[in-house]
């Protein structure tokens, strides 16, 4: 079955906000269980999966910096929030009998493994889902940056960016009902038009390494597997 798959190894970027469901803060476990179920569907189809989680449901370093906190310190706190989310997601996934490992860019030996590239790849080869926490381990970098870097390091075929909308638009569709959706768009146009998909430096890294990105809504159950199978609603960013 694996031989017929377009993408055999993927990295899924899940924002912290996606784990909140309709709440204003923290975790909605029904929502997380649905996401875990979608990931299981993908694994059962024969796809190797890695995940990068954000931390915005708990803490946003950039917002704290705006009110006077030292930006580097704020970003480190945000990285710790991603570890909380990774451990939460791991526990929910393991309740569905999905074998997982959490690897953190910030060493926390008593709660998860340190990020070591070869170890992470070995886990994936053994059929385990690897959840990357701690961002890149450096301040002033987004978890989107971590997602692109880890996807490249893991030799993933595609980055799946799960968002609150069903693709990339020329303006915010929540504010502009006439916003135009792109079904495919190249990296250059994302950068030139300053589309707020992810930070532009990260898009440039994806472009340099020819990493395709698919942007889709995580709200629709079953959407992750659909996007990998060229079904459902999404936008593809590639050369």
Swiss-Prot record:
Its main location: cytoplasm. Inhibited by UTP. Coiled coil: none annotated. Its EC number is 2.7.4.22. One of its GO terms (cellular component) is cytoplasm. One of its GO terms (molecular function) is UMP kinase activity. Belongs to the UMP kinase family. It is found in: Cytoplasm. ATP binds at residues 13-16, 56, 60, 163-164, 169, 172. This is Uridylate kinase. NCBIfam families: pyrH_bact (TIGR02075). Keywords: ATP-binding, Cytoplasm, Kinase, Nucleotide-binding, Pyrimidine biosynthesis, Transferase. GO terms for biological process: 'de novo' CTP biosynthetic process; UDP biosynthetic process. The keyword NADP does not apply. UMP binds at residues 55, 75, 136-143. InterPro entries: AceGlu_kinase-like_sf, Asp/Glu/Uridylate_kinase, Uridylate_kinase, Uridylate_kinase_bac. Homohexamer. Pathway: Pyrimidine metabolism; CTP biosynthesis via de novo pathway; UDP from UMP (UMPK route): step 1/1. It comes from Rickettsia bellii (strain RML369-C). The keyword ATP-binding applies. It is an enzyme of class 2 (transferase). It catalyses: UMP + ATP = UDP + ADP. Catalyzes the reversible phosphorylation of UMP to UDP.
């Amino acid at each position: 079955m694996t031989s017929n798959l377009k993408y055999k190894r993927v990295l899924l970027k899940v924002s912290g906000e996606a784990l909140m469901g309709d709440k204003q803060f923290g975790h909605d476990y029904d929502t997380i269980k649905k996401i875990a179920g979608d990931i299981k569907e993908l694994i059962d189809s024969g796809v190797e999966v890695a995940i990068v989680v954000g931390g915005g449901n708990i803490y946003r370093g950039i917002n704290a910096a705006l009110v006077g906190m030292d930006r580097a310190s704020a970003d480190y706190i945000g990285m710790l929030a991603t570890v909380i989310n990774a451990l939460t997601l791991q526990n929910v996934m393991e309740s569905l009998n999905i074998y997982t490992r959490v690897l953190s860019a910030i060493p926390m030996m008593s709660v998860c493994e340190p990020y070591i590239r070869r170890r992470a790849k070995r886990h994936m080869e053994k059929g385990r889902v690897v959840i990357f926490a701690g961002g890149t381990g450096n301040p002033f970098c987004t978890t989107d940056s971590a997602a692109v870097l880890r996807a490249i390091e893991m030799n993933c075929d595609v980055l799946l960016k799960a968002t609150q909308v069903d693709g990339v638009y020329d303006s915010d569709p929540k504010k502009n009902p006439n916003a135009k959706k792109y079904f495919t768009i190249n990296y250059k146009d994302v950068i030139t038009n300053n589309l707020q998909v992810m930070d532009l430096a990260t898009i440039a890294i994806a472009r340099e390494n020819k990493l395709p990105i698919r942007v889709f809504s995580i709200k629709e159950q079953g959407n992750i597997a659909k996007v990998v199978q060229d079904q459902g609603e999404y936008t593809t960013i590639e050369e």
